[in-house]
UniProtKB/Swiss-Prot annotation:
Protein name in the entry: Phosphatidylglycerol--prolipoprotein diacylglyceryl transferase
Entry keyword annotation includes Lipid metabolism: no
Annotated binding of a 1,2-diacyl-sn-glycero-3-phospho-(1'-sn-glycerol), by residue: R136
Family per similarity comment: Belongs to the Lgt family.
Enzyme class per UniProt: transferase
Membrane topology: Multi-pass membrane protein
Annotated Gene Ontology cellular component terms: plasma membrane
Principal place of residence: membrane
Its job: Catalyzes the transfer of the diacylglyceryl group from phosphatidylglycerol to the sulfhydryl group of the N-terminal cysteine of a prolipoprotein, the first step in the formation of mature lipoproteins.
Keywords: Cell inner membrane, Cell membrane, Membrane, Transferase, Transmembrane, Transmembrane helix
Organism: Thermosynechococcus vestitus (strain NIES-2133 / IAM M-273 / BP-1)
């Protein structure tokens, strides 16, 4: 029988140094992502140094965008606690905000550097989904982003302070962080396989597959969560996921059915 998951705490003590697991995992995801993207870039005849430069742009844009996205949809709380808006180390970022910020940064970078946006995006996409798989474990250490109550063998124990007020006596919940992390690993392996297939080399393919595959999993998992960002009765992440699936499907239809390239700054 699988034991219930339980976070050891949000911090890691190393002598006189205290690190927050959330921030540490983001840093690990960034460094692994840069390393992998540079390796993939060489296989697509893209200068790895340009990928390193792009990575700075992505980090500078994505992390603040992820935080602002989260704050915007939780403004009822943050307008009364403005001092907490910048306390990103405590958690509270939204991956869709990071993706949007990263896309804007990559669009500007590739335009300035006269690179193919889609070719660069295909190099970055596997690293992005792998980083998401790693980053989800930050939710585990923070005891956040969990799902509905459950008694399954792989249930997640949530401490009393983190439980919803209406479920204060309910201890175990779906480990949605684990579901999404495992799903993202599967998407990562799919993208790596596609990257090596000559028939799927059209620029934009991997980003479109990423948009569809990640969003399918996120739509389902979001339906289990207790803390979804909401706009009225709608779960924002599910709405964004449907839009991403539609855009990804359009992109693949254009590339492989119509045989047309996606609009780009520069022809690869």
């Amino acid at each position: 029988m699988i034991a219930a998951f339980q976070s050891p705490g949000a911090t890691l003590e190393l002598g006189f140094i205290t690190l927050r697991w959330y921030g540490l995992l983001i840093a690990v995801a960034v460094f692994i992502g840069i390393w992998l993207s540079q390796r993939l870039a060489r296989q697509r005849q893209i200068d790895p140094e340009q990928i390193a430069d792009l990575s700075i742009w992505l980090v500078v844009a994505a992390i603040p965008a992820a935080r602002l996205y989260y704050v915007a949809f939780n403004w009822g709380f943050y307008q009364k606690h403005l001092d907490q808006v910048v306390q990103i180390w405590k958690g509270g970022i939204a991956i869709h905000g990071a993706i949007l910020g990263g896309i804007v940064a990559m669009a500007i970078f590739t335009y300035v550097q006269r690179l193919s946006f889609w070719q660069v995006a295909d190099v970055v996409a596997p690293s992005l989904i792998l980083g998401q798989a790693i980053g989800r474990w930050g939710n585990f250490f923070n005891s956040e982003a969990f799902g509905a109550p459950t008694d399954l063998p792989w249930k997640l124990y949530i401490p009393v302070p983190q439980r919803p007020p209406e479920l204060i006596n309910t201890a175990y919940y779906h480990p949605t962080f684990l579901y999404e992390s495992l799903w993202n690993v599967g998407v990562f392996l799919l993208l790596l396989w596609l990257f090596r297939q000559p028939r799927y080399q059209k620029p934009g393919t991997l980003l479109m597959v990423y948009a569809i595959a990640y969003s399918l999993g996120r739509f389902w998992i979001e339906g289990l969560r207790m803390d979804s960002l909401m706009l009225g009765p709608l779960r924002i992440a599910q709405v964004v996921s449907l839009v991403a699936i539609a855009l990804g499907s359009w992109g693949l239809f254009r590339l492989y059915y119509q045989g047309k390239p996606l609009p780009d700054w520069q022809t690869p």
